[in-house]
A protein has these predicted regions:
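Positively charged n-region of N-terminal signal peptides that target proteins for export
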Residues: 1-4
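A short, solvent-exposed, low-complexity linear motif enriched for acidic/polar residues
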Residues: 20-258, 262-303
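Hydrophobic helical h-region of N-terminal Sec-dependent signal peptides
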Residues: 6, 10-12
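C-terminal motif of bacterial Sec signal peptides marking the signal peptidase cleavage site
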Residues: 15-18
Length: 303
């Protein structure tokens, strides 16, 4: 079975934890007491997929000083990332006792052995997911975070599928674009889109179920563009769903660091290839401000 963390890396880590287990750090690192860490995952969805399952076998975190710490799951966690949109998330572990202090990065071990451990379900059926660089290096998030002494810290990984799922040589590949957010420093953004905008002349098609998404860019009055790994790229994106009571389409973006944002709506998101500079049109653009923690900001799009 292929894993995105080498066995050697796991064995050389400072300590191994089983799922639901507790740590050995009764006295913390040096004279510092422990803190409790909760690590979760959320997702920004992608068009034309009904399910995206990724199987995680371990989590590795790296203190600023000293060797890394690895949490190995007794049973690998297989998660449908498409079920974690908006402000929804799933814990990898909850209130795990770890040494307090600064941590430099997080690495995810993902199973991709080609036997339906990690896969995507598209309109034409199920396809295995491969991770080009994951067999040796894992999925690494270089954002740092701090675990406070004798306190609880919660951070969430945004696994942005719209930026991460690419088709290459007939295979679906994960080239993950991951960001790490401290929950206490993050809020959420929601709004609605007039149904008439979802079937306009500039849309990719006349089906309101495809291509409709909001892209969120850092700062007010920011330039907006497609996803192509060239600035400006959105911080994150969100799909929308029909509100049967209003007849409009609603969206929610969770785990956004507090600050100012430019929110852009497009009905051409299904044409956005993250590997290519596409001519995506944005039908409406507005500014929004997000407060923390977990304060909902609004940004609506009307005809």
């Amino acid at each position: 079975m292929k894993k995105s963390l080498l066995t050697l890396s796991l064995l050389s880590s400072l300590s191994l934890y089983g799922c639901g287990g507790s740590s050995d750090y009764s006295g913390g690192r040096g004279d510092m007491p422990n803190g409790e860490l909760t690590l979760s995952i959320t997702d920004a969805a992608v068009d034309n997929a009904s399910e995206v399952w990724v199987q995680f076998s371990a989590i590795e975190i790296k203190p600023e000083s000293g060797p890394s710490i690895t949490h190995v799951f007794d049973t690998p966690m297989r998660i449908n990332l498409l079920s974690l949109q908006g402000s929804l998330s799933q814990d990898f572990f909850n209130n795990l006792s770890v040494p307090s202090g600064v941590y430099n990065w997080v690495r995810l071990a993902v199973d991709t052995d080609g036997v339906a451990d990690s896969y995507i379900i598209m309109n034409d059926g199920m396809h295995e997911l491969t991770i080009p660089s994951g067999s040796k290096s894992g999925l690494k998030i270089s954002n740092g975070f701090i675990v406070g002494a004798n306190s609880q810290t919660a951070v969430t990984i945004d696994f942005d599928l719209r930026k991460s799922v690419v088709m290459s040589s007939g295979q679906y590949k994960l080239k993950p674009v991951l960001r790490l957010v401290n929950n206490d420093e993050a809020g959420a953004l929601n709004g609605s889109i007039d149904a008439a905008l979802t079937t306009g002349a500039n849309c990719s098609d006349q089906d309101p179920k495809t291509g409709n998404a909001v892209y969120v860019f850092a700062g007010h009055d920011a330039s907006v563009d497609d996803i192509d790994k060239i600035s400006p790229d959105p911080v994150t994106t969100a799909l929308m769903s029909l509100n049967v009571q209003t007849g409009n389409y609603d969206y929610e973006v969770g785990f956004l660091p507090a600050g100012n944002y430019t929110v852009a709506y497009t009905c051409m998101a299904d044409l956005d290839d993250p590997e290519v500079d596409d001519a995506i049109l944005f039908q409406s653009v507005t500014n929004a401000a997000v407060d923390a923690p977990v304060e909902l900001a609004g940004a609506d799009f009307n005809r």
